[in-house]
Amino acid sequence: MKIGILALQGAFAEHAKVLDQLGVESVELRNLDDFQQDQSDLSGLILPGGESTTMGKLLRDQNMLLPIREAILSGLPVFGTCAGLILLAKEITSQKESHLGTMDMVVERNAYGRQLGSFYTEAECKGVGKIPMTFIRGPIISSVGEGVEILAIVNNQIVAAQEKNMLVSSFHPELTDDVRLHQYFINMCKEKS
């Protein structure tokens, strides 16, 4: 099994460490050539946290947006954390256009405010259990379509969800020692292969 990690910007190295802990091979995807070279071998894709506007621009500049979108729509399992969640959203409240736009949800960027407004908590995540959650200027999911399953709620806000082959979290599971949400994603990838 090999998981691709979008490595244009953001917390990609931390995701690679978690996958290594789980004994799963990962490959950093920095450009279209990387993606096309590894695409047939990929069991899944992680879109890490970072700055969603910058990541969206880089995806467009590298001509990666459409090939990744097509792969996701064709069933490639994808896990978007924080900015990665924003990339997957069909609608972003403060923007005119979405990025990948594959997941039926409306999101609000930087809902948890500035860096100083960031926080840590623990909450129940369906299918995983009670897990630690680190929020760093994270988005919230304002609403979801009928096909989207809500996995976690914190302070009456949706912070994790799944739609078919797409898993998202507003928080950063890669910044804790708890690997269960990544294991949940690995299990999704195994079911698809």
UniProtKB/Swiss-Prot annotation:
Keywords from the named record: Glutamine amidotransferase, Hydrolase, Lyase, Pyridoxal phosphate
Active site: 82, 172, 174
GO biological process: glutamine catabolic process; pyridoxal phosphate biosynthetic process; pyridoxine metabolic process
Pathway annotation from the record: Cofactor biosynthesis; pyridoxal 5'-phosphate biosynthesis
One cellular-component annotation, GO: glutaminase complex
Annotated Pfam families: SNO
Entry binding sites for L-glutamine: 50-52, 109, 136-137
TM spans (from-to): none
GO molecular function, one term: glutaminase activity
InterPro entries membership: Class_I_gatase-like (IPR029062), PdxT/SNO (IPR002161), PdxT/SNO_CS (IPR021196)
Catalytic activity reported: aldehydo-D-ribose 5-phosphate + D-glyceraldehyde 3-phosphate + L-glutamine = pyridoxal 5'-phosphate + L-glutamate + phosphate + 3 H2O + H(+); L-glutamine + H2O = L-glutamate + NH4(+)
EC number: 4.3.3.6, 3.5.1.2
Claim: Lyase is one of the keywords in the record: yes
NCBIfam families linked to this entry: PLP_synth_Pdx2
Function: Catalyzes the hydrolysis of glutamine to glutamate and ammonia as part of the biosynthesis of pyridoxal 5'-phosphate. The resulting ammonia molecule is channeled to the active site of PdxS.
Quaternary structure, from the entry: In the presence of PdxS, forms a dodecamer of heterodimers. Only shows activity in the heterodimer.
Similarity-based family: Belongs to the glutaminase PdxT/SNO family.
Protein name: Pyridoxal 5'-phosphate synthase subunit PdxT
Upper taxonomic lineage: Bacteria, Bacillati, Bacillota, Bacilli, Lactobacillales
